Swiss-Prot record:
Binding-site positions, chlorophyll a ChlzD1: H118
Uppermost EC category: oxidoreductase
List of residues binding [CaMn4O5] cluster: D170, E189, H332, E333, D342, A344
An example Gene Ontology molecular-function term: chlorophyll binding
InterPro entries, alphabetized: D1/D2, Photo_II_D1/D2_sf, Photo_RC_L/M, Photo_RC_L/M_CS, PSII_D1
Gene field: psbA
Other notes: 2 of the reaction center chlorophylls (ChlD1 and ChlD2) are entirely coordinated by water.
The family this protein is said to belong to: Belongs to the reaction center PufL/M/PsbA/D family.
Organism expressing this protein natively: Lepidium virginicum (Virginia pepperweed)
Binding site for a quinone: H215, S264, F265
Name this polypeptide is given: Photosystem II protein D1
Chain positions with N-acetylthreonine modification: T2
């Protein structure tokens, strides 16, 4: 009798690490994108929490007038924010080691740049991780495509807009009131409400909410009865069951009679594609709008576009919005400018006769 002994090569440490990283059996999938996502998002989150609680005031306008944003310096949850990096830094890469001291780094708003850049890397990797997990499971890639809309929006306000305006100080502050301030100033300087891409974004968000509510209520109203009156209707569903849990024909018939026949989907797949695509495309357009307005390709200007036969201006809603824009513009960064940009751009009249 002859025994044949086969020497099995033990898998290398690197091979086991690769298998663990890409395993779909882990409770939470890591993936190669996760290797970068986890440290960047942890860094952004940690610095955000510390800075929101304890960061000293930041000289956002670069004029030696620091603005307080943290809780320990007098703010609450509503008014608090991570103040954007100083206009004195502009678009320069400003890590801690570029400052003369940590105090200088904090005074110039270094935490904002650190948080934003790590956050954008992290959410981009999260999107890649969605694609990676879909690929491993043999799924189609549209989850990552849908997530690209909020990623594009965040990239627009935190990176593209500061690049276009020439300074991270023009980025969106990381806080509730700071976000509202960003929106108001954006309207004042770019007339975003009159930009078609913003209008498409509004239609996408509000339309998506409407369609989500319509779909959820139609499905909930046409569930196939599996329970008694004394049980929750939710008990009639078992995870993984093969049968439909609602009657799409009944839902189609109801909605087709409520509006008209062709307003109602008769294909569940095309319906769900529509529910995903509508808000995603709208938010894509808004991100594109922010990115074009970053370089001052602004919303429509219909100011004083209606005049009577004598040449006198008949005010329209556009003129009311323009007046509001001017009011908002003269109030923001009030000590940084003598005049708002669009008023200072007009040639001054001669004073020497």
């Amino acid at each position: 009798m002859t025994a044949i002994l086969e020497r099995r090569e033990t898998e290398s440490l690197w091979g086991r690490f690769c298998n663990w990283i890409t395993s779909t059996e882990n409770r939470l999938y890591i993936g190669w994108f996760g290797v970068l996502m986890i440290p960047t998002l942890l860094t952004a989150t940690s610095v955000f929490i510390i800075a929101f609680i304890a960061a000293p005031p930041v000289d956002i306008d670069g004029i030696r007038e620091p603005v307080s944003g943290s809780l320990l310096y007098g703010n609450n949850i509503i008014s608090g924010a991570i103040i954007p990096t100083s206009a004195a830094i502009g678009l320069h890469f400003y890590p801690i080691w570029e400052a003369a001291s940590v105090d200088e780094w904090l005074y110039n708003g270094g935490p904002y740049e650190l948080i934003v850049l790590h956050f954008l890397l992290g959410v981009a990797c999260y999107m890649g991780r969605e694609w990676e997990l879909s690929f491993r499971l043999g799924m189609r890639p549209w989850i990552a495509v849908a997530y690209s809309a909020p990623v594009a929006a965040a990239t627009a306000v935190f990176l593209i807009y500061p690049i276009g305006q020439g300074s991270f100080s023009d980025g969106m502050p990381l806080g509730i009131s700071g976000t509202f301030n960003f929106m108001i100033v954006f309207q004042a300087e770019h007339n975003i409400l009159m930009h078609p891409f913003h209008m498409l974004g509004v239609a996408g968000v509000f339309g998506g909410s409407l369609f989500s509510a319509m779909h959820g209520s139609l499905v909930t109203s046409s569930l196939i009865r599996e329970t008694t009156e004394n049980e929750s209707a939710n008990e009639g569903y078992r995870f993984g069951q093969e049968e439909e849990t609602y009657n799409i024909v009944a839902a189609h018939g109801y909605f087709g009679r409520l509006i008209f026949q062709y307003a109602s989907f008769n294909n569940s797949r095309s319906l769900h594609f529509f529910l995903a695509a509508w808000p995603v495309v709208g938010i894509w357009f808004t991100a594109l709008g922010i990115s074009t307005m970053a370089f001052n390709l602004n919303g429509f200007n219909f100011n004083q576009s209606v005049v009577d036969s004598q040449g006198r201006v008949i005010n329209t809603w556009a003129d009311i919005i323009n007046r509001a824009n001017l009011g908002m513009e003269v109030m923001h960064e009030r000590n940084a400018h003598n005049f708002p940009l669009d008023l200072a751009a007009v040639e001054a009249p001669s004073t020497n006769g």
